[in-house]
Amino acid sequence: MKKNDLSPEAFRFEGKMSLKQALPLGMQHVLAMFVGNLTPLLIITGACGLAGGEFADLRVTLLQNAMLVAGIVTLVQLYSIGPIGGKVPIIMGTSSGFIGVFSSVTASMGGGVLAYGAIMGASLIGGLFETVLGFFLKPLRKLLPSVVTGTVVLSIGLSLISVGVNSFGGGNTAQDFGSVENLLLAIFVLVVILICKHSGSTFLSSSSILVGIICGYIAAFLMGLVLPTTALNAEGVAYTKAWVLNWNKVAEAKWFALPQLMPVKPVFDMRAIAPVMIMFIVTAVETVGDISGVIMGGMDREATDTELSGGVICDGLGSSFAALFGVLPNTSFSQNVGLVSMTKVVNRFALATGGIFLILCGLVPKLGALVSIMPQSVLGGAAVMMFSSIVVSGIQLITREPLTPRSLSIVSVALGLGYGIGANNGILAHAPQMLSLVFGGSGIVPAALVAILLNLAIPKDENG
């Protein structure tokens, strides 16, 4: 829809729009975030071993709940309930920033329902912690300039690239990992995404990830018609190849079902809570950046303290609310911030139609089942693009202000020492358990802490 075809009300947050005009604008936002909202769940449930077998129904339920929660939290962010919600034109969804930390928690706890329960327990507590931060946002903002937030975002992206590449090859648990079929399917999805992204069409560009995924499904279906779908492993046992679509799951799923509260019981374990609490500080900073970006880009003004505080509070309580439904933390979606900045459409009702559509999707298990059968290589083709773009976003944040010797030192040491320690757990083998819990596993948490400490410790001067 061209800008000239829109009512002037589309460019006012509280403008009155007809459903006919609002719906396509809301759907554009859903298309921009739909896959990204479900990708973290697909990756973490896979890492926990909850992708198939006896856990197949659980995974469908979690995907269904992810859509429902994203829709509800989006509406709260748009309209607010008291101090909860910033009344800002932002779409909320499942955060990919936690994937690295949750992957390390999963590895340290041996996977399974216990590890996923620990992730839910940590998310529940961490969300409440972020809520408290939302009430004391002013001093927090002063501690976290763009060089710190950029370093953190960069470390998040770096930690996710290997996750995306694993999916690109078919998933590292697949017996045909790295096969020609998996690689070609992933490359095909990536090429489709790139073509759509640079097609010149706003609609195709904003929905490029979803279009790439759909084309990946079609390609996998056609491959199943002309290529062998099974093979023999080294022991001579037959297995189904990772790229094969299991349509039986979709056929067996219901058309309608109410959401299930606490499909996974929260477990409170310090191995998960300690690093996740740090990540929620990072998430609060990201949300501040997203709200600032969407207000400046869409409304041409600075965000108010009330908008920022309400947005972060909604972020925190939304994440705790998500944990009650077995869903990973909810946060603002940066790709939707970019869409608002590009189109200047900030109408609350238009975005709300997208939130309502997500809620309706959350009541349809067949849709969750359809997503759950996505081949890892199809997901990987999209994930490589999504996760690498996070790296670029981090670089853009770091270079928002001229690089000085001070900022270069913060970035270099935070990434080198923080990420290096996180990537080599053995170096903390003789450290106190709490130190190992916070710094071990993912490189995100140590990089964030080192960047914050160096920003406080290194004095500022005229030369930087």
Enumerate the predicted regions with their spans.
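N-terminal signal-anchor module of multipass membrane proteins
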Residues: M1-I90, G97-M109
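Intrinsically disordered, low-complexity non-transmembrane regions of multi-pass membrane transporters
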Residues: M1-L25, T229-L261, M296-R301, L453-G464
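Juxtamembrane interface elements at the cytosolic ends of transmembrane helices
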Residues: K2-S7, N37-L41, T45, F188-S199, ...
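Membrane-embedded helical hairpins/re-entrant loop segments and their flanking transmembrane helices
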Residues: L19, T45-K87, A274-R348, N463
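Hydrophobic alpha-helical transmembrane segments of multi-pass membrane proteins
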Residues: M27-F34, L124, V148, S179-L183, ...
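Membrane-embedded hairpin module used as a gating/binding unit in multi-pass transport
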Residues: N37-L38, G216-F221, L225, L232-S319, ...
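Short, non-helical or kinked segments that cap or interrupt transmembrane helices
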Residues: T61-L62, I84-F98, K142-T151, L204-V211, ...
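Membrane-embedded alpha-helical modules
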Residues: A107-V226, T353-G464
